[in-house]
Design a protein with these regions (language model features):
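N-terminal Rossmann-like NAD(P)+-binding subdomain of aldehyde/semialdehyde dehydrogenases
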Residues: 1-143
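Terminal end segments
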Residues: 6-9, 441-446, 454, 483-484
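Conserved small-residue-rich beta-alpha loop and adjacent elements
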Residues: 115-199
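Donor nucleotide-activated moiety binding/catalytic core segment of transferases
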Residues: 135-152, 215-225, 374-385
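Short, surface-exposed connector motifs at secondary-structure boundaries
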Residues: 173-178, 204-205, 225-232, 408-413
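Short hydrophobic alpha-helical runs that function as membrane-insertion/retention elements
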Residues: 176-180, 235, 257-258, 416
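Conserved NAD(P)+-binding/catalytic subdomain of aldehyde/semialdehyde dehydrogenases
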Residues: 200-303, 308-310, 451-484
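NAD(P)-dependent aldehyde/semialdehyde dehydrogenase
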Residues: 292-413, 424-430, 442-470, 474
């Protein structure tokens, strides 16, 4: 059954011809989209010179367009977003309440103040809008400017915000952008693009946006498109397989900016057990880090290291904290977290095995597939910790922080930490092991766009940093004067 159609948005045109079917990631439904092999030659710019119209725009005009776009992205009145939402109910594992909320939070992203903060903090408005002068020690004059590039985005499909951020970053940098829509969020980027065309028809920003779907690995499309004379950068949010797949096309002139899959962790200090009120507050914060978007994100808490100690009192505290976290987790509002629609059956089998092995683990909840907390009764995570999902987390009591740092590596993205004093103690150490973001417990999934991501600054990386040098022979010693007489 064809559940919905994913059009091709081609620089202001909406194309629904030459449709072919594709499978969704969940269920038996299919969707249809134009056969991209018929349109791949039309996706890239004919010439890089065609980007010059973007540089005729003042940043105030860019802000005007984005603000109008944000105002138009009102879920209750925007038919494009409503269509994207209906498709997401078929394509995505998240429940309706969460998917709808992911659309309702879009308008503030495009506000003037927010866009200005992102652009200035992550690139610098002076570099985006003109040539910034510097004088070097040898006397040469440099003028540096951040130019946009021809970018292909392969965004993740875990919520509408990713598609919105992708478009926002591209517009800020004055880039020409092609977006490969994810199969589990197929229409959000299309909906935003169509809304942009409604509020700014024939505008340069609209004419430098392409959104479409093709199956990853389609050689008829990718071998034609993924070339330096078509695109200069690929921003890939995908899973390990898709990121590895993209690397086959990387060559001089074509750069990969990988926002690759990560795991996150939590560290809770002894102060959490000072009194019942503190423990309850810590439990509420930890439950939020676990439960947001049903633990589908890279930033969600999964393994929670607790500096409770492993003696009898320490284990009792860890078990009590586990009970409180479970209670708070199952009480989160539906726009934040619900029992998962498609729990991992293999993980559920592991849970039941742990439940029967109560000398080593205490399992709290999980009988109704609503989520669970597994409290290790030793200082090791469960051996299935990479599988933790669907609101299942593992509390690991430890005696010292050394046990925690040993578990941090290059795959560690976010670490939520309580209390703040412990975070300050660890902030110069954890990055050495691979941690990329340290945040207050409870804010792991409350991510700021105006900040680095995955230990890089992706918006700066999307830019080409161009240097104009001026060397006066009377100031900068010319090489020809170094020749022997």
């Amino acid at each position: 059954m064809i559940a919905y159609t994913v059009p091709l948005f081609l620089r202001g045109r909406v194309i629904t011809d030459d449709l072919v079917p594709f499978d969704t990631r969940v269920g038996a439904a299919q969707f249809q989209a134009p056969d991209m092999s018929r349109y791949v030659e039309q996706l890239p710019l004919k010439s890089p010179a065609d980007m010059s119209d973007l540089y005729e725009l003042s940043f105030d005009e860019i802000l005007d367009v984005l603000e109008a776009l944000g105002d138009a992205l009102d879920f209750d009145s925007n038919a494009h977003l409503q269509e994207a939402y209906e498709a997401s109910l078929v394509a995505n594992v998240l429940p309706p309440e969460m998917m709808q909320n992911s659309y309702r939070i879009l308008p503030p992203l495009f506000s003037r103040d927010n866009v200005t903060e992102i652009a200035d903090s992550q690139v610098g408005l002076n570099y985006l809008n003109g040539w910034v002068p510097h004088t070097l020690r040898d006397g040469r004059e440099l003028r540096v400017r951040a130019f946009g590039s021809r970018v292909l985005h392969i965004p993740a499909g875990n919520g509408g915000l990713v598609s919105a951020v992708t478009i926002l970053r591209s517009v800020i940098t004055r880039s020409d952008v092609i977006i490969k829509a994810p199969s589990n969020d197929p229409l959000t980027a299309i909906a935003i693009a169509r809304t942009l065309a409604d509020v700014a028809p024939n505008h340069p920003i609209t004419k430098h946006l392409v959104v479409g779907y093709w199956k990853g690995g389609d050689l008829a499309v990718e071998e034609n498109l993924y070339k330096p004379h078509h695109i200069e950068k690929i921003v890939a949010w995908g899973g390990l397989a898709s990121v590895k797949h993209v690397t086959r096309y990387i060559q001089p002139g074509l750069e990969l900016i990988a926002l690759d899959p990560k795991r996150s962790a939590t560290i809770i200090g002894r102060e959490a057990f000072d009194d019942e009120d503190t423990m309850l507050e810590v439990a509420r914060r930890a439950a939020t880090d676990i439960g947001v978007a049903n633990q589908e994100g890279c930033a969600n808490a999964r393994v929670i290291y607790v500096l409770s100690g492993t003696d009898a009192e320490g284990l009792a505290n860890a078990n009590r904290l586990g009970e409180l976290i479970y209670r708070e987790l199952t009480s989160l509002p539906a726009i934040i977290s619900t029992p998962p629609r498609y729990p991992n059956r293999e993980l559920l089998d592991h849970l039941e095995s742990s439940r029967m092995n109560d000398d080593f683990y205490r399992v709290i909840g999980g009988e109704q597939r609503e989520g669970a907390i597994v409290v290790s009764q030793l200082d090791e995570p469960v051996d299935y910790s990479p599988m933790l999902s669907g609101r299942v987390a593992n509390i690991v009591p430890v005696d010292s922080i050394d046990k925690v740092t040993a578990a941090v590596n290059a795959y560690t993205q976010t670490i939520g930490i309580y209390p703040e004093s412990l975070k300050r103690r660890l902030r110069d150490t954890l990055p050495l092991f691979g941690a990329q973001r340290l945040t207050s417990l409870g804010y792991a999934c409350n991510v700021a766009i105006a900040a680095p991501q995955d230990a890089i600054e992706p918006i700066r990386r999307m830019c080409k940093w161009i240097v104009d040098e001026e060397c006066e022979a009377s100031v900068v010693i010319p090489l020809w004067k170094l020749a022997p007489a």
